[in-house]
Amino acid sequence: MAIERTLSIIKPDATKRNLTGKINAKFEEAGLRIVAQKRIQLTLAQAGQFYAEHKERPFYGELTEFMTSEPVVVQVLEGEGAILKNREVMGATNPANADEGTIRKEFALSVGENSVHGSDSPEAAAREIAFFFSGLELVG
């Protein structure tokens, strides 16, 4: 399997509860390296641009409001098959359906407040990483 990079966002429900370290430990235990990380406060415009593909969905307004409600931690994870591995570590979007030991099973509060975001494809990973990081910020 190839070495990949993927974007991860630790969402406001998790940063508010000081879960960044526990979530990072899950990534590292799964063999993912954190090659870039920063804590930021998204603006409504930034959240709207990042989630533009969901603009016509009924949850878009709630999503962008939530993502700007508290700081988030954006990070680039690297490793063999990082995109799929990250999605496995995160667990199902709905924490009720997530496997034991996954981030969402342990930390998510609801489907909307599900603690983490992860890129779902190589194309999304490239686009999402470039949205938050310059090449100079990626140290691997």
Curated annotation (Swiss-Prot):
Lineage: Bacteria, Pseudomonadati, Pseudomonadota, Alphaproteobacteria, Rhodobacterales
Family annotation (Pfam families): NDK
Sequence similarity: Belongs to the NDK family.
Top-level EC class: transferase
Listed EC numbers: 2.7.4.6
Residues binding ATP: 11, 59, 87, 93, 104, 114
An example molecular function term from Gene Ontology annotations: ATP binding
PANTHER family referenced in this protein's UniProt entry, alphabetically: NUCLEOSIDE DIPHOSPHATE KINASE, NUCLEOSIDE DIPHOSPHATE KINASE DDB_G0292928-RELATED
Active site: 117 (pros-phosphohistidine intermediate)
Record-given protein name: Nucleoside diphosphate kinase
